[in-house]
């Protein structure tokens, strides 16, 4: 019997999505990395190796480590060209050749966007609200059309990066202009669906252990009619402890899993850990923590979390949460290899 019909019948009989949702969802649990900085490292002459010291291209190494997808950020007009739509195409082609799924992460900025900064692109700085929606939609469409024209399939699209406080400030700052943040988000949603109707559109927030910020944003988006298909979360025990949100990493794991169960039920959408990371200087402990994050996402969210993505594992130096040393993966990355070997 067709599995979709079985699921539909069960839903009708049981009358509750949660009772059978985990069984009916697609069996693939996605394991991935945001390796957007790869081409910049290559331009600097950096050679990446596997743990044995054999030269590797970064995308291929991620697959070798057990990953089945990658995440790529897009900036509007980056001054050096990295993370432009053309740069994203370079990386997307590599992923396609390897049979890996692709997530596109729109920052809607010329540079980094996160809860502490969501700067309007320089070319858009004088736009009014309607013009801003049009610019956002145009940028979204043009980027995705470039990918589609080159035979790239995009499975997920983030409309904004860690938009805990909205984006495109001050116009889209959620605390002051939730209606405009919602309108801008919905403009992005519509643009994605024009190009990739089947793509899953994600709204992404930080600090998955804190339910209050999720209620604030998603209650607001629902109030003003913004559409989204999935909630993306960041899970960083290191930053949670630094911000005094938790006492230890165990608390982060427990609280993020509980929050994902809660928001999937409250808002009727699926979830994904679209960013995570652990301390690079503590690789053995880091592997343990990452294994627990993956395990919690996969087995303790009532089947409503669809994957875990490590942010910039190849990044070394001042960034404390990479997973490489001397341009080689540490034991931290074994958590993905072991998770990939686990039977569904």
Task: Tell me the role of every PLM-derived stretch.
Residues 54-113, 175-198, 249-254, 258, ...:
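Aromatic-lined substrate-binding rim segments of carbohydrate-active enzymes
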Residues 43-47, 112, 262, 280-292, ...:
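Aromatic-rich peripheral "rim/lid" segments of glycoside hydrolase catalytic domains that contact
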Residues 9-18:
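Bacterial N-terminal signal peptides
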Residues 31-33, 70-72, 102-106, 155-159, ...:
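Hydrophobic faces of well-ordered beta-strands that scaffold small-molecule active sites
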Residues 84-87, 114-221, 226-228, 240-258, ...:
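Active-site cleft segment of glycoside hydrolase catalytic domains centered on the general acid/base Glu
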Residues 25-58:
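Boundary/entry segment of secreted carbohydrate-active catalytic domains
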Residues 36-38, 75-77, 107-109, 159-164, ...:
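Active-site beta-loop-alpha junctions enriched in small/polar residues
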Residues 1-10:
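Bacterial N-terminal signal peptides that target proteins for export
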């Amino acid at each position: 019997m067709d599995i979709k019909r079985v699921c539909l019948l069960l839903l009708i009989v049981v009358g509750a999505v949660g009772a059978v949702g985990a069984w009916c969802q697609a069996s693939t649990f996605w394991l991935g990395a945001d390796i957007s900085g790869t081409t910049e490292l290559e331009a600097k002459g950096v050679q990446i190796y596997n743990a044995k010291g054999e030269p590797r291209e970064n995308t291929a190494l991620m697959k070798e480590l057990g990953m089945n997808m990658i995440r790529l950020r897009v900036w509007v007009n980056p001054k050096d060209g990295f993370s432009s739509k053309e740069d994203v195409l370079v990386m997307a082609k590599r992923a396609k050749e390897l049979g890996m799924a692709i997530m596109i992460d729109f920052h809607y900025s010329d540079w980094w966007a996160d809860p502490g900064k969501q700067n309007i692109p320089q070319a858009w700085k004088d736009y009014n609200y309607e013009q801003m929606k049009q610019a956002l939609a145009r940028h979204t469409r043009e980027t995705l059309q470039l990918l589609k024209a080159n035979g790239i399939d995009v499975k997920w699209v983030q409309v904004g990066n860690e938009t805990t406080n909205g984006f495109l400030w001050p116009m889209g700052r959620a605390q002051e202009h939730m209606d405009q943040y919602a309108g801008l988000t919905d403009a992005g949603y519509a643009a994605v669906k024009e190009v990739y109707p089947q793509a899953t559109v994600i709204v992404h927030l930080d600090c998955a252990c804190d339910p209050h910020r999720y209620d604030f944003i998603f209650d607001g988006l629902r109030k003003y009619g913004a559409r989204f298909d999935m909630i993306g979360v960041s899970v960083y025990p290191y930053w949670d402890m630094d911000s005094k949100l938790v006492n230890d990493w165990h608390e982060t794991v427990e609280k993020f899993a509980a929050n994902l169960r809660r928001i999937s039920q409250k808002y009727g959408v699926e979830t994904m850990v679209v960013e995570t990371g652990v301390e690079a200087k503590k690789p053995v402990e880091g592997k343990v923590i990452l294994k627990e994050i993956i395990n919690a996402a996969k087995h303790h969210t009532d089947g409503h979390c669809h994957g875990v993505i490590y942010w910039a594992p190849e990044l070394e130096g001042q960034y404390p949460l990479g997973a490489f040393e001397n341009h080689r993966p540490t034991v931290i990355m074994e958590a993905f290899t072991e998770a990939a070997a686990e039977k569904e």
